[in-house]
Amino acid sequence: MDFKKLAAQYKSELLDNVLPFWLEKSQDLEYGGYFSCLDRDGSVFDTDKFIWLQGREVWMFAMLYNKVEKKQEWLDCAIQGAEFLKKHAHDGNYDFYFSVTRDGKPIIQPYNIFSNTFACMAFAQLAEATGSEEYKEIALKTFQRILDRRDDPKGRWEKSYPGTRPMKGFALPMIICNMALEVEHILEDKSMLDHTIDECLSEILNVFYHPEYGVMLENVSPDGTPIDCFEGREINPGHDLEALWFMMNLGIRRNDKALIDKCVEIALSVIDFGWDKEYGGIFYFQDIKKAPMQKLEWDQKLWWVHLESAICMIKGYQLTGNEQCLEWFKKLHDYMWTHFKDEEYPEWYGYLNRRGEVLLTLKGGKWKGCFHVPRGLYQIWQILETL
């Protein structure tokens, strides 16, 4: 495998294909912020603004400005999105709405804590790019709200009946693992950060990870006991593999080889569990008992699942030299470039059916924005350059 040639392929796809698409097609220069709902050619098909995706796009361009090149157009793109978030995206208490209209009127209440996590990452990254104390303060206030809400993330918008079947989700500790490293540079109290990381790692490895299955469960009872219901049996292989490369980064930060080795061991188990042996690609959802799924999209092949898994595998290989990781990376690389890449228009498809045929031609929507494709290309490019 020619790592240098591959690195150039990922770099070129990011800088020459994907980023120009979002810069040109997504910016709303009239009202601020970004259009997320972009058809195959980049034409806008819906003007609502989803705060997860607004925050992610600010983060993306600020991160690239900080890490790749001091390009003014990247910084300008991030700043105009952040100004929209600052003015329109939260309730004054730094709880961020799920969605707003094109001109910034709230549509969906701030029930979803992930709007906060991506806003926090955005303002923290932009504070680093600009030196702005205001952006730093917004990031810190938002981070505090995430910690305040962590045990009851939906608060008054929680629809499950209290006490009958208490359950907690894997997504939050997984995102906080990543966010911890994102906000490290703006936190005064590093011990609080270490405590937060300890809690998240412990929760993932001791509560959500079940060695008898070799995977993380997506929802468990508060003490980690599996629950035999639709939600309790659910596995999201892409989530697991994304979390595992976040945790490898924490292993690097802590110089913890045992943690990195454990992550690689679990990752190889998860990808084997999640891989479609008949058609190739990774299933979106699976049931731990192989029972029928409640989610009709369970067998679809999604862009982010494969990109995050590819990052996990090439990072596992980089850190441990495990040849199985490299074999899986090759498999994922071939699958992604032959199925998700659009040969005619920029950016990548997001949604394929089980057989790997394009299900939706959109390049951005309610859940797909300027995030997993560019972040994945960037991460893989950077890792390949070290090999």
Residue spans for each PLM region:
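Glycan-recognition and catalytic cores of secretory/periplasmic carbohydrate-active enzymes
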Residues: M1-L387
